[in-house]
Amino acid sequence: RIAATQGTALNQEIKETLKPKYADKVNIYDSIGPSGKVVITITAKAANKGEALKVSCDHLGISLAEVISFGDAENDVAMFEITGSAVAMGQADEIVKAAAKTVTGKNTEDGVAMAIDRILKTGSP
């Protein structure tokens, strides 16, 4: 995994340069780094949250259809595509929200707790 923080405009320029050349070999997307800043993340094509979740669920004997995934960055989309339900956080980019089945509040507004509360009350996020 390679991550770099350069600033939003430069990040966009870097992604636009790299994606056409390397999209078949690596994943290139924005994510939130430990500092809370947006970083460009580059990973091997097979290294994604969806693949990691498949392995974890298989090991635990849990069906992916029973899993609800939460995310706010493009690196969560692979996970959204394989789980029974996918919830985007309110601060997520539009591409992430479009990939989710529903959108909850922002992480600063206890969005995960809001979704869990809805699940407990209605059976659906």
Q: Residue spans of the language-model regions?
A:
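Conserved acidic, metal-coordinating active-site core of Asp-based
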Residues: 1-70, 74
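Mg2+-dependent phosphoryl-transfer enzymes with acidic/Ser/Thr/Gly-rich catalytic loops
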Residues: 43-125
